[in-house]
Swiss-Prot record:
One of its GO terms (cellular component) is glutamyl-tRNA(Gln) amidotransferase complex. Its EC number is 6.3.5.7. The keyword Mitochondrion applies. Belongs to the amidase family. GatA subfamily. Its main location: mitochondrion. Allows the formation of correctly charged Gln-tRNA(Gln) through the transamidation of misacylated Glu-tRNA(Gln) in the mitochondria. The reaction takes place in the presence of glutamine and ATP through an activated gamma-phospho-Glu-tRNA(Gln). The lineage of its organism: Eukaryota, Metazoa, Chordata, Craniata, Vertebrata. Pfam families: Amidase. It comes from Mus musculus. This is Glutamyl-tRNA(Gln) amidotransferase subunit A, mitochondrial.
C-alpha cells in the first residue's frame, strides 16, 4: 500500500480498503525500520495517530475532507508547527516550540493530512547535502537499494560509502523515497527541493514565487524562499499544490489568484510545445551520463513532434556569484533576530550584553551559518554596498530579463539538468567546503529562484552505478499547471524504476504490491 500513489491511496481510503490508522501505523513502522537514514528529527507519533483516528471517524461518517484526508505527510524542520519542536537543525533553536502553524502546514492539516514528523536538513537550510545540521547527516535511501548494490558491486555489509541525499531538504526527500510518507514539504531558495529530489529519485517541485505562502517558513532569503513539494510522482505534486496555492493575508508577497487545480490532464499534445535547451548549461563539469540523458530527453520531445531549439541565457555565467552576494546579504539580515533574548538558545556568559550576544551566536550557529553572516555583513558595509549588493541586484534584473526574453520568443518550457552528477558518497562530498559545494550543486537551479519561476525535477533513469538522475523543467511565471502537465507527460515516457530497498523488500506487502519494476526508457549510451 505504501508504494502506491497518493491518489490511489486516497481512493483506497474512500473505498474502505485501508483505514487511516492502518496507513499511519504502517508508515510509523517504516520510519522506525529506516531510522538509519536519519531522515526525521522529530517523529510525531502521538499526533499522527490522533489525527488518523479523527480521519477514520470522518470516513465512517462519509465526510471525507478530500484527497489528502488520512494521507501521511512530513514537514521540513524549518516550518513552524504548533506544539512540535522546530529546530532548523540548529543549536540556536533546540527546544523551540512555535505557538502557531506555518500556513502551508495548516492547509495540509485542514485537509486531514497526517503529520508523521519533522525532517532533517542542513542548519537553517544553508547547504546542498543535508550534512551540516546538528542532528547529523541524512543518508540517501538508494545507498541501500538492490540496484546500487548490484551495479556498484557494493558489499551489503559495507556501510562506509553511503551516499548523500543532496540538500537542504534531504530529510524530506529521503522520507518520501523510503516510503515513510506520501508527500513532504521542503523549502527551495536556490535548489533545495529539486537537488535532493534528483539524488533520491523522486519529484521535487518549486512553485512560482508568490503562489504559495511563506508565512511560518523560517526565512533564509526572503526574496527567493518558497515552500517546495516532494512526492513520488507528478500527479501527487499537483494534488498537494492544489491545497497549498492561494493568497495568504499573512504573506504580502502571495498573489490574489485562484488556487491551482488539484490535478493535471492525463494526456497532452506535445507537438504544440516549444522546448528550449539553454546552451549555457552545457558546462564542462557536467557528467557524461547526465549530458547523455539530457540529449536523449530532448530527442524524446522532438520525436513526439515538439519543437526543440537551443536558446541563450547570456547572463548565466554571473548567476552563481550574484546569488551568493544576494543570498548572504539577506541571510545576515535575517539571522540578526537570533540574539538570545526573545527565543532560542541563550549563552550563560553574562559579562556584558555584547559578550552574551557574541557567545550566544558562537554557540548557537555552526561555522557555515556564521560564515554566511560574515560574508553578508561584508557586502552590506557602507563602503561595499554599491559595489556588491546594488550591482548584484542589477545583475539579477538582467538574469530575470534573460528568462523573460526566452519565454516571449515562443518557448513554453526549458529543459535542463538538475545536478552535475548523480549522488556522491559522503566521504567524498565533505572533502570540499560548504561554499564550494553549494556553488557547484546550485549551478542549474539558483537562477530560477532569482527569477521567481516554477521548476520541477523529474527522475529519468539510473546511472551506470544504479543511482537516480533527474532533469529539470522550467516554466513561465505562474504557469505552474502547464509545467506540471508537461512534467507528467515526460514522467510517463521515461518510466523511472521503483527503488528496491534491501531489508524492506522482504515485506513486500508493506511497500510494493508487486515486485515488478518498469524499465526506464532513457538509457545510457
Amino acid at each position: 500500500m505504501l508504494g502506491r500513489t497518493l491518489r490511489e491511496v486516497s481512493a483506497a481510503l474512500k473505498q474502505g480498503q485501508v483505514t487511516p490508522t492502518e496507513l499511519c501505523k504502517n508508515c510509523l513502522s517504516l520510519i522506525k525500520k529506516t531510522k538509519y537514514l536519519n531522515a526525521y528529527i522529530t517523529v510525531s507519533e502521538e499526533v499522527a495517530l490522533k489525527q488518523a483516528e479523527e480521519s477514520e471517524k470522518r470516513y465512517k461518517q462519509g465526510q471525507s475532507l478530500g484527497d489528502l484526508d488520512g494521507i501521511p505527510v512530513a514537514v521540513k524542520d524549518n516550518f513552524s508547527t504548533t506544539g512540535i519542536e522546530t529546530t532548523c537543525a540548529s543549536n540556536m533553536l533546540k527546544g523551540y516550540v512555535p505557538p502557531y502553524n506555518a500556513t502551508v502546514v495548516q492547509k495540509l492539516l485542514d485537509q486531514g493530512a497526517l503529520l508523521m514528523g519533522k525532517t532533517n536538513l542542513d542548519e537553517f537550510a544553508m547547504g546542498s547535502g543535508s550534512t551540516d545540521g546538528v542532528f547529523g547527516p541524512v543518508r540517501n535511501p538508494w545507498t541501500y537499494s538492490k540496484q546500487y548494490r548490484e551495479r556498484s558491486r557494493q558489499d551489503a555489509g559495507d556501510d562506509s560509502h553511503w551516499l548523500i541525499t543532496g540538500g537542504s531538504s534531504g530529510g524530506s526527500a529521503a522520507a518520501v523515497a523510503a516510503f515513510t510518507c506520501f508527500a513532504a514539504l521542503g523549502s527551495d531558495t536556490g535548489g533545495s527541493t529539486r537537488n535532493p529530489a534528483a539524488h533520491c529519485g523522486i519529484v521535487g517541485f518549486k512553485p512560482s514565487y508568490g503562489l504559495v505562502s511563506r508565512h511560518g517558513l523560517i526565512p533564509l532569503v526572503n526574496s527567493m524562499d518558497v515552500p517546495g513539494i516532494l512526492t513520488r510522482c507528478v500527479d501527487d505534486t499537483a494534488i498537494v499544490l492544489g491545497t497549498l496555492a492561494g493568497h495568504d493575508p499573512k504573506d504580502s508577497t502571495t498573489v490574489r489568484n485562484p488556487a491551482q487545480p488539484a490535478s493535471v490532464p492525463g494526456g497532452m499534445d506535445v507537438s504544440r510545445l516549444c522546448i528550449g535547451i539553454p546552451k549555457e548549461y552545457l558546462v564542462p563539469e557536467l557528467s557524461s551520463e547526465v549530458r547523455s540523458l539530457w540529449s536523449q530527453a530532448a530527442d524524446l520531445f522532438e520525436s513526439e513532434g515538439a519543437k526543440v531549439i537551443e536558446v541563450s541565457l547570456p547572463h548565466t555565467c554571473y548567476s552563481i556569484v550574484c546569488y551568493h552576494v544576494l543570498c548572504t546579504s539577506e541571510v545576515a539580515s535575517n539571522m540578526a533576530r537570533f540574539d538570545g533574548l526573545q527565543y532560542g538558545h541563550r549563552s550563560g556568559v553574562d559579562v556584558s550584553t555584547e559578550a552574551m550576544y557574541a557567545a550566544t551566536r558562537q554557540e548557537g550557529f555552526n561555522d557555515v551559518v556564521r560564515g554566511r553572516i560574515l560574508s553578508g555583513n561584508f557586502f552590506l558595509l557602507k563602503e561595499n554596498y554599491e559595489n556588491y549588493f546594488v550591482k548584484a541586484q542589477k545583475v539579477r534584473r538582467l538574469i530575470v530579463k534573460d528568462f523573460v526574453d526566452v519565454f516571449e520568443s515562443g518557448v513554453d518550457v526549458l529543459l535542463t539538468p538538475t545536478t552535475l552528477t548523480e549522488a556522491v558518497p559522503y566521504l567524498e562530498f565533505i572533502k570540499e567546503d560548504n561554499r564550494t559545494r553549494s556553488a557547484q550543486d546550485d549551478i542549474f537551479t539558483q537562477a530560477v529562484n532569482m527569477a521567481g519561476l516554477p521548476a520541477v525535477s523529474v527522475p529519468v533513469a539510473l546511472s551506470n552505478q544504479g543511482l537516480p538522475i533527474g532533469l529539470q523543467l522550467i516554466g513561465r511565471a505562474f504557469c505552474d499547471q502547464q509545467l506540471l502537465t508537461v512534467a507528467k507527460w515526460f514522467e510517463k515516457q521515461v518510466q523511472f524504476p521503483v527503488i528496491q530497498l534491501q531489508g524492506l523488500m522482504d515485506d513486500g506487502s508493506l511497500v510494493l504490491e508487486n515486485g515488478k519494476l518498469t524499465s526506464a526508457s532513457l538509457t545510457q549510451r
